[in-house]
Regions:
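Non-catalytic, mostly N-terminal accessory regions of nucleic-acid modification and defense proteins
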Residues: 1-168, 230-233
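Conserved S-adenosyl-L-methionine
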Residues: 146-235
Length: 235
């Protein structure tokens, strides 16, 4: 039986996934939909988590939402290009070579409206990372998306991490990181099996700068991994 927190996360993931039907008329594939959703969710989640300082002024969620439907799509397309060249390093990497697959202004307006209507209070409380990872899992389980090769099921990841028993003294590297699941699980294991509040300054510095490394050459997947890692506190 699921916990209330899991039910909340699953409900939000289901609502987000169902929005892919909005894009069918635009000929958008499943993996293109998740990419599109990543752009929009990044802006919305930055607002909800009070981290909009990493985004340049004038290119944030409220700026997108405030545009009238006819001009919103044009603004959004220009914003993707702008964000790929401005803002924090993470912002620039996530939006590198970003472009929209949306063709109709009304389609974008529906997505913005529906995303804004989600239960963001409980999403913040239960964790943005689990929400986004649930969306990635949904995409991986959809055979038509072809994304399964980049997403390893969490039970398998957790089992492998439990066998390896990583510690803060280790260096964790995933040379084919996919959407970042192994790195996230290793980080969770380390923190749950130690007392981060008692780490020395040297240990904290090592944790932040010299513990987790990942490589992913497919840009689409690399983009998703960066978003996933950021929402789990690894950036």
């Amino acid at each position: 039986m699921n916990t209330p927190a899991q039910n909340i996360t699953q409900d939000i993931v289901a609502r987000l996934w169902n929005l892919c039907n909005v894009l069918k008329d635009d000929g958008v594939t499943y993996h293109q939909y998740v990419t599109e959703l990543t752009y929009l969710l990044f802006l919305k989640m930055a607002k909800e988590t009070n981290t909009e300082a990493q985004l340049p002024d004038g290119y944030r969620w409220d700026d997108l939402e405030s545009k009238s439907a006819p001009e919103r799509l044009d603004f959004y397309r220009k914003a993707l290009i702008h964000l790929g060249n401005n803002g924090s390093l993470l912002v620039r990497e996530i939006f590198t070579n970003a472009s929209s697959f949306i063709k109709k202004p009304n389609t974008l307006s529906i997505l913005v409206t529906e995303i804004d209507k989600l239960d963001w209070y409980n999403a913040r409380r239960e964790g943005m990372g689990d929400l986004y990872e649930g969306l990635l899992e949904k995409n991986a389980n959809e055979k038509k998306s072809g994304a399964g090769q980049y997403f390893t099921p969490r039970p398998l990841i957790d089992s492998m991490v439990a066998v390896m028993q990583p510690t803060l003294e280790d260096i964790i590297q995933d040379p084919a990181a996919g959407t970042g699941g192994f790195l996230i699980a290793a980080n969770r294991y380390i923190r749950e099996n130690s007392t981060p509040d008692t780490w020395t300054e040297t240990q904290q510095r090592k944790y932040r700068r010299n513990t987790f490394y990942g490589m992913e050459f497919v840009q689409y997947t690399h983009r998703l991994a960066l978003m996933n890692l950021m929402l789990h506190g690894l950036d």
